[in-house]
Swiss-Prot record:
It comes from Oryza sativa subsp. indica. The gene is MCM8. It is an enzyme of class 3 (hydrolase). Belongs to the MCM family. It is found in: Nucleus. One of its GO terms (cellular component) is MCM complex. It comes from the Eukaryota. The lineage of its organism: Eukaryota, Viridiplantae, Streptophyta, Embryophyta, Tracheophyta. Keywords: ATP-binding, DNA damage, DNA repair, DNA-binding, Helicase, Hydrolase, Meiosis, Metal-binding, Nucleotide-binding, Nucleus, Zinc, Zinc-finger. GO terms for molecular function: ATP binding; ATP hydrolysis activity; single-stranded DNA binding; single-stranded DNA helicase activity; zinc ion binding. Residues 339-546 form the MCM domain. This is Probable DNA helicase MCM8.
Amino acid sequence: MYDDGPRKGKPGGLSMDAATAAGLAAVWPEYFPEESEFAADGRSARLAADLVDLFSSPDASDLLSRVEDDGDILSLPVDFQQLSNLTWITEALQENPKEALLSMGAAVHLIVCASRDLQLGDINKINIRLYNHTKTIALKNLKAAYIKKLVTVRGTVLKVSTVKPLVLQLNFQCMKCATKFPRVFCDGKFSPPVSCSIQGCKSRTFIPMRSTAKLMDFQKIRIQELASGESHEEGRVPRTIECELTEDLVDCCIPGETVTVTGIVKVLNNYMDVGGGKSKSRNQGLYYLYLEAISVRNSKVHAASGNSDAASGSFGFQAFTEKDLEFISKFKEEHGADVFRQILHSFCPSIYGHELVKAGITLALFGGVQKHSIDQNKVPVRGDIHAVVVGDPGLGKSQLLQAAAAVSPRGIYVCGNTTTNAGLTVAVVKDSMSNDYAFEAGAMVLADRGICCIDEFDKMSAEHQALLEAMEQQCVSVAKAGLVASLSARTSVLAAANPVGGHYDRAKTVNENLKMSAALLSRFDLVFILLDKPDELLDKRVSDHIIALHSNDGGPFTANKRIRTVPQFNPSTEFGVGRTSLASRLRLHPEKDKDFCPLPGPLLRKYISYARSHVNPRIFMPSPAADSLQKFYLDLRKQSDSADGTPITARQLESLVRLAEARARVDLREEVTLEDAKEVIDIMTESLYDKCVDEHGVVDFARSGGMSNQKQSKKFLRALNEQCDLQKKDCFTMNEMYNLADRISLQVANLDAIVESLNNAGYITKKGSSMYQVVTSSYQGSQATWSGR
């Protein structure tokens, strides 16, 4: 935007005129309170004079018009890339960033007052908020060499403290001679005068004049390095750094948000007056690094400024270079309609088969479109897709989740048996220094706008209730220690669980196999069930695949070929469309795809991030895609009416819409097509069939929740025993049993089958054509004991 002109090299190439010198001298105490007087020949003064000349040019009028007035606080966002051609400014920012930014603020102060016909004292200090500054630095590289340097870091907000006033300047009055001494506290370090400087008065007692205090809003945040970043090291505790926010920067972020912080690296003495002797002297030399924030950029700032990308589910400031955009364009152009299959097989290539399960997880990675996320007058509709994989041990469920967390631009992987309720949602911790309570984000909040993979989901039954709100309302409400707040948790939950007993029992429902409530299970858009059944041909291919992975001597297709491992079946035609067609289309062919090479993880991560940031597909009404989804949903509702329960609700229709939007996002399309709807129906049919089929292969929609026939039989037998005690008899007719089943709301399709199973098990005995005796009743037992006497 600007060029050097006559100031190539160091600042001070032009002489300072009298008007500029007088103006800078008037505002200088506001920006440099620690300096006793304005020195026109000083380095900072000469830099400020050059900046006054620069900002007086017509090119700078657009920049100065962006001065933000937030009450008594004025700030000016400045894009560093617009000043990158001015070497004298970049050198000044590199040598002494604090001095350069204050000089820039003083220069802007003069120009703004002149352009608005204001007196220099009519406006307060203007803070320069420099953003888009060079390349971000990994937290592991932030060491002593960067002290007093200007850096940019990215991370997830882990903790936010309360806003407090910080004293910058205060007058003290001597108790003996009543002389007033102004004191300036650099970096907020409170340092009262030691002794009175008046001759003849050596008093050491001073009274702070609190009415003269100059205050500033102050807040501390802690950011943590991104878990999915390229610089992240496995097995190491994630690095964190404290950031100090002041004035207009306070309350600009909440726990769980991804922020880009530009600031000056500073050090603070970690000395605490504890212990004694050698330990005390050793602690005096310890320092820790922290950032004095100059600017903070996050999704909330972008959304407030009208940027729709932040509100549409972006992963937050994912930078795309020209090479990245060229790769995305060429990849889409080269594969065309086959992009979904290419991405699906690039995701977790070490797992053999499971095409439809991988398809569901891939759609969850791309996600749907969130509606009404910014409008406060409407209820937000979530766009994130939740999926759970249930099955026997050893089928690769954990590897699928780890692969999803690895390729996601923002993914977090946790294990259920080591996760607490607070660690999953949000915790309230007490700061040891200030004794204040603050929020500390858990896994769901840290995975905001990303993926949260929860393994061993069945081992954390106590924490299931904490997920109900986070999965549907996309937020976590907390009311602890006097703090009441709601934190965003716009994340897709991918869960993996082992059934009770180690083996999935088709005779039981999904709820009974997992010990999961029906309310939580209904929040999952997709439920996949993997069964381990012996198959000679399939086992041979799986063993070949595993050996090829370990030997590393196979061809490119040997280690990456896919053959479906889920047993095939033939669902009834009235249940829905055939679901083997999509699996066969997604499967790699040994001949046609022998040269298939998976997409590398970093490139796949870039593609997913671009799709979520810039592609927002919609379903138009009327359209073939909308008609197809509506017809499938109405058919499911019609079939579920015949069952005792009604598990097919509007949530299934919303799930279909989200999946269809995610399928369109994979192909970078803005409109959902009929082919997208058909593929989504195939995946949904797979999920519904696995969830609702019983041990005989019969589809029963009531099995998606509630109790199995075994539990219903126990409930019916318990009711019979109670009736024996109440009515003083142990024989019942079939009509009486039918009436009893209605009274206890027994949810079975065939009561005769339940009665027959109880008869075969010996709990009841048939005494006639329609008469049964309850053998297990206490009434029958007491009668037998009396007759024996």
